[in-house]
Amino acid sequence: MTLNYHQESDSPRIAVIGLHGWTGTEHSMVPVARSMRIQSAKWYIPRAPYKASTGQGYTWFSGSADKGWKVKKTFNLLDTLIQQVMNDGFDQDNIILFGFSMGGSLSLSYGLGIQYQLRGIIPVAAWVREPEELINSASMESKQTPILMIHGKDDSVVDHKKSITVAAEMKNNGFSIH
């Protein structure tokens, strides 16, 4: 696993796993981490395991709707990373999944599929392909994880109204949406 780190202090209390968007790298989220200046956080920023079809950068999912999607390497990577974060001294309830675009979609699908509650999930400009599947596959424990969905109105790639619809559906199904 290729991993980058960022922290503002020597005694972080919260771990933030920063998941880049499509064609990103382990360096993509560092400017975000720096600009947020969260004194109590240590950022873990992994590189997605699949090479992007564009030839530049990396992707969390590989394949297509026709041929099927490869995600096993991604979920194995996150399982390993969560274990590393916990070995570094962070409890599950002090771990935040923060993802941008495709990384935001991953933060939701992974974070809601695990069998425990996290400190939070923050998807930014995330695209949720199958909202009903996401809702139905969530564990009872992960449904309690607070989710802060962020999406700008001027997004030319992912329509922000889809995020509003997904957030409303999730809230109606008992998720902790903010």
Locate predicted features.
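Catalytic histidine neighborhood in serine/cysteine hydrolases
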Residues: 167-178
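Short alpha-helix in the alpha/beta-hydrolase fold that links the catalytic acid
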Residues: 29-32, 159-169
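Short beta-strand/loop motif that positions the catalytic acidic residue
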Residues: 143, 148-151, 155
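The conserved beta1-alpha1 loop
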Residues: 17-21, 125, 151-152
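Gly/Ala-rich beta-loop-alpha elbow adjacent to hydrolase catalytic centers
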Residues: 98-103, 107
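Acidic catalytic loop of the alpha/beta-hydrolase fold
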Residues: 130, 154-159
